[in-house]
Each structure stands twice: as C-alpha cells, then as structure tokens.
Amino acid sequence: MFAKAVAVSLLTLASAQVFAADCKVTVDSTDQMSFNTKAIEIDKSCKTFTVELTHSGNLPKNVMGHNLVISKEADMQPIATDGLSAGIDKDYLKEGDDRVIAHTKVIGAGEKDSVTFDVSKLKADEKYGFFCSFPGHISMMKGTVTLK
C-alpha cells in the first residue's frame, strides 16, 4: 500500500513538472541580421522570464553585433533611433530609457548574454515586441512578445 502511495505521488509530481510553464527562451542571432524566431510567448504564470541571446555567426560585435531589447511595440523604433548616439559601449540604448522593459548587451560571434525581468511589467492588453538596437538592424531583426 505504501509503495502504491509513493508511486502515485511521484507520478503526480512528475506530471506537474511536465506541465509547468517554461519561463525561459533562447534566441539565436546570425551574421545575416536575423533572429531564429519572430515571436516570444510568455506564460502569465511566470513571475520572472529569462531571455538568453546567442550569436552563431562569425563576425565581431563592432561589425555585426546584436542585442535583444523588449519594449511596447509603439516604442521600438523611437528607442532604436534615440539609442544611435549612445554607441556600442552602451548597447545602442539611451541611458535610463524607461521605455525599455529588458535588454541584453550587444554580443558578437560565439558570445551569449541573458536578461531576466519581472513579468508583472507586462500588461495583457498591451502589444509588446523585441528588436536589435544595433544601427539599421531593427528593420529585419524584430518580433512580437505575447503574454498568454
């Protein structure tokens, strides 16, 4: 009887792990100015969410660097434009820009970086996106962030 109870408990625990929300995503970037996804979905049950950015290309960050910035969709282009003068040392982001929800640093070939942010910063009725703020990259390197 005890063995059955233990077995049932373990199966219940294991199935709970299978259905737990995945509160992390890895996004790859390339020398062809692209991310490997156009959409990031965040489960409402996540307290925090982590985005890991990798760069599978061969070029250094000063030539083909990438970062990943999360903001409201309406703020994406203004953030990228305002960040141009900040330069690579500040990840092409204006210092203290509170329109930025989260961002990784600019990385080059073979590098990776991650950022973890509080999901409570996102509202269900707002549209969010992600993009690369390296000059000129936002035109091809962007996608949606959805709270589901």
Curated annotation (Swiss-Prot):
NCBIfam families reported for this sequence: azurin
User: What does this chain do?
Assistant: Transfers electrons from cytochrome c551 to cytochrome oxidase.
Q: Return one Gene Ontology term, BP aspect.
A: electron transport chain
Q: Which Gene3D superfamilies match?
A: Cupredoxins - blue copper proteins
Keywords from UniProt, A to Z, are: Copper, Disulfide bond, Electron transport, Metal-binding, Periplasm, Signal, Transport
InterPro entries according to UniProt: Azurin, BlueCu_1, Cu-binding_ET, Cupredoxin
Positions of Cu cation binding: H66, C132, H137, M141
Question: Entry's SUPFAM superfamilies?
Answer: Cupredoxins
Task: Give compartment(s).
Answer: Periplasm
Annotated PANTHER family: AURACYANIN-B, OUTER MEMBRANE PROTEIN H.8
Assembly with partners or alone: Monomer with an intramolecular disulfide bond but can also exist a dimer with an intermolecular disulfide bond.
| An annotated GO cellular component | periplasmic space
Per the UniProt record, which residue ranges are transmembrane? none
Q: What sequence ranges are listed for the domain Plastocyanin-like?
A: 21-148
Signal peptide positions are 1-20
Q: What is the name of this protein?
A: Azurin
Organism whose genome encodes this protein = Pseudomonas putida (Arthrobacter siderocapsulatus)
Output one GO MF annotation.
Answer: electron transfer activity
Cystine pairs annotated here are C23-C46
